[in-house]
């Protein structure tokens, strides 16, 4: 996704349904295609599993800029800013074979958790990062925050 003169362009969407063990390699292939100058935004689920996943991405994607995005709020709340811009005509798609599946998923999204919503999540996260710069930290900032948490835990315990 990119932005030019307050218009947001969804340039390409890679959609794949694979085992969890193959998700990271699929994302790494996309990152390799995008190049080192494009940051990789990784949503961080709450709890230890989310932290472990982020660490794995940071380690495996050496050389890339990794930005973590702590997930908070419902999917509907996170999707609202993107949805508003879509409804306002400020989001454009580049033509591609992925358009129909992408639009179908966005149109069927109701926030209930039923059905597929990964493309909604990815679009919302990318939009929120570009438009608002919210809830993301670069790799160095992530590790600084983790070190600070450890210091606080040691003081308390």
Annotate each language-model stretch with its function.
Residues 2-112:
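Mg2+-dependent endonuclease catalytic cores in nucleic-acid-processing enzymes, primarily RNase H-like
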Residues 117:
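Conserved catalytic/ligand-binding micro-motifs in nucleotide and anionic cofactor chemistry
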Residues 126-157:
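Acidic two-metal-ion nuclease catalytic site recognized across multiple nuclease folds
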């Amino acid at each position: 996704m990119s932005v030019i003169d307050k218009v947001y362009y969804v340039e390409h969407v890679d959609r794949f349904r694979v085992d969890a063990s193959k998700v990271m390699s699929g994302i790494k292939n996309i990152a390799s295609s995008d190049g080192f100058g494009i940051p990789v935004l990784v949503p961080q689920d709450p709890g230890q599993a989310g932290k472990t996943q982020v660490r794995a991405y940071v380690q495996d994607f050496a050389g890339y800029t990794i930005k973590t995005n702590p997930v908070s709020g419902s999917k509907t709340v996170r999707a609202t800013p993107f949805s508003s811009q879509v409804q306002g005509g400020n989001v454009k798609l580049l033509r591609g074979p992925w358009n129909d599946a992408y639009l179908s998923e966005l149109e069927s999204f109701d926030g209930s958790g039923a059905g597929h919503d990964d493309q909604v999540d990815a679009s919302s996260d990318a939009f929120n990062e570009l438009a608002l710069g919210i809830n993301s930290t670069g790799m160095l900032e992530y590790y600084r925050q983790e070190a600070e948490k450890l210091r606080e835990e040691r003081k308390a315990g």
